[in-house]
Amino acid sequence: GVGRLSLDRLLPLLEEAAVLGIPAIALFPVTPPELKSPDGSEALNPDNLMCRAVRAIKAALPDLGVICDVALDPYTTHGQDGLIDDEGYVLNDETLAVLAQQALVQAEAGCDVIAPSDMMDGRIGVIRKTLDEAGLHHTRIMSYAAKYASAFYGPFRDAVGSSGALGKRGKETYQLDPANTDEALREVA
C-alpha cells in the first residue's frame, strides 16, 4: 500500500526517521481536484502543499535532506507530466520553462534536491540554469536517467492522484518503452 500523510502526521514520522539516521526523504504531492488545471499552475504556487511541507520540515528538522519531485502530473487535469496541445500531445519544449519554475519555487522553499521525474528532453540543463541564475548553486538535481512507460508506475500514479485523469492515454511519447533496452542504455549513458 501507498500511504498519504497530512503535514500534521508527516512531521512526527520524520522526527522518528531522523532519530533512526535516515538522511533524506522524498516528497510527492497530492493536489486536490479543485486546484488542478490543464497547465498545472498550482505547481508554481510558492504556497502549494509541496512548498508548505518543505518549509515545515526544514523548520522542525533543518538537517533532514528533502528531495522534491518535479513533474506536472500531480497538478494537471489531464494527468500528463507536461503541457499538452489540443490533440493531447505533450509539448516538450514549452514544458521545460514550467518545470524550471516549479523547481525554483521548491528550491526557494528549502528543498535540498530537485528530482525531475517528468522525463522531458533537456529538463536538467534548463533547471540547473534557472537555479544557478537565482543563486541556488547548492541545490542538487537527482536525474531520472531512464523512466519507463510501464504499469509498474500505476501505484505511484494512484498515490499522486493522476491515474484517473490519464484515462486510456499513456506516457509513451516521453517515457521509455520497457521492451527497448537499447534506448534505455542510450538514455543513461
Give the label of every model feature segment.
Residues G1-A189:
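Alpha/beta enzyme core
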